[in-house]
Each structure stands twice: as C-alpha cells, then as structure tokens.
Amino acid sequence: MASLFKKKTVDDIIREQNKELRGTQRAITRDRAALEKQEKQLEMEIKKMAKAGNKDACRVLAKQLVQLRKQKTRTYAVSSKVTSMSTQTKVMSSQMKMAGAMSTTAKTMQAVNKKMDPQKTLQTMQNFQKENMKMEMTEEMINDTLDDIFDASDDEEESQDIVNQVLDEIGIEISGKMAKAPSAAKGLPSTSASKSSGISDEEIERQLKALGVD
C-alpha cells in the first residue's frame, strides 16, 4: 500500500512516458501494416474492374486508394514525431541527471567551504613554508660540516699514503744499494763508494716532487 501513495520521481515519470511512446509506436506500425495490406487488395480490385471494363468502379476504388495512401504517409509522419519525442525525453532525462549531479557537487563544495577557514589555511601554508626553509638550511649546514670533516680526513689520508709510498720506494732502493755495499768486516767504504751506494738528498727531493709531495 505504501508504494501506491509514494510520490513519483522524475525518473519514474520519464520511464512511464517512454513506455507509452513505445506502445504508441507499436500501434502505428500495426496500423501501417494493415493499410499496406488493404492497399494491395485495392490495387488488385482496380485491376480486376479494369479488365472487366467497369470504369465507374475503377474510379471509386482509385479514390479510396489515394485516401489510403495518404493515411499511410501520415503514419510515417506520426511515427517520426513519436521517435522525436522519445529522443527528447531521453535527452531531458540525461540533462536532469546532470543537473542533479551538479547540485550534489555544489552542496558538497558548499559544505567544504563552510568547514574551511581561508585565513587559517593561508597561515598554515605560510608556517609550513617557513619551517620547511628552516629544515633545509639546517640540513645544508650539517652537510657542509660533514663535508669539511670528511674532506680534511681524506686529505690527511691521501697525504700519508703518498708519503708512505715514497718512503717504501726509497726503502726499496736503499735496501738494493745497501745489499751491494761492503760489510763492516771488510772495512769502511771509500768516499766515492759511499756516494755511489747512498741516495742523495736531491734524489729524495726529486722523487717526492714527482709524486706531488712538496
């Protein structure tokens, strides 16, 4: 019983109208089919009367045929009109659905705008930007400090590696030359032998410069 007194929605009304239009279209199609059948019968009667030489009967039947064909033409016009109405109904239904969707969206936007405070939102964004800049500055300072520490450590390690390399090379050369030097039991080497077996300061300095150590 509740459904009998329920208020019809726009969709319900449009659905009923489309149903009626479809019924009207089917009725027009049936009427046209009947007219076409009657048209063929009249044509056969006219031919029959013409063969019999009955001109008056042919004249009367011809007038009926003209009226019937006019009526059949009207059915096409009415059918076209019904189709147009059905199309318009569908367009209206689509437009009303779009309007309903826009109305719902507008209400949602209105509710959101009521909850939002533009001034407060702007202040929040400004605070975020300010704190973000502070964080970036702090991060940059920390990175610079760490870079300085590690760069200095790397420089010291690199310098020490170079010095060790030079000393190793010098040690290898000294060992090689001292292996050829005479032992203490055979007496001290002469001045010329000492000069040839040892490494001069100039040679050490030259090797250091070659490795980039000042």
Curated annotation (Swiss-Prot):
Q: Region Disordered: start and end of each range?
A: 178-203
Q: Name one GO biological process term.
A: protein transport
| PANTHER family for the chain | CHARGED MULTIVESICULAR BODY PROTEIN
Query: One cellular component GO annotation, for this chain's record?
Result: cytosol
Keyword annotations of the record: Coiled coil, Cytoplasm, Endosome, Membrane, Protein transport, Transport
What family does the database annotate?
Belongs to the SNF7 family.
Highest taxon above the source species: Eukaryota
Compositional bias (Polar residues) spans?
189-199
| Coiled-coil intervals | 16-55
The entry describes its oligomerization and partners as:
Probable core component of the endosomal sorting required for transport complex III (ESCRT-III). ESCRT-III components are thought to multimerize to form a flat lattice on the perimeter membrane of the endosome.
The answer, when asked if Membrane is one of the entry's keywords, is yes
Q: What is the name of the protein in this document?
A: Charged multivesicular body protein 2b
Q: How does it sit in the membrane?
A: Peripheral membrane protein
Main function: Probable core component of the endosomal sorting required for transport complex III (ESCRT-III) which is involved in multivesicular bodies (MVBs) formation and sorting of endosomal cargo proteins into MVBs. MVBs contain intraluminal vesicles (ILVs) that are generated by invagination and scission from the limiting membrane of the endosome and mostly are delivered to lysosomes enabling degradation of membrane proteins, such as stimulated growth factor receptors, lysosomal enzymes and lipids.
**What InterPro entries does this protein map onto?**
Snf7_fam
Motif stretch (MIT-interacting motif): 202-212
Species this protein is from: Xenopus tropicalis
Where in or outside the cell it occurs: the entry states: Cytoplasm, Cytosol; Late endosome membrane
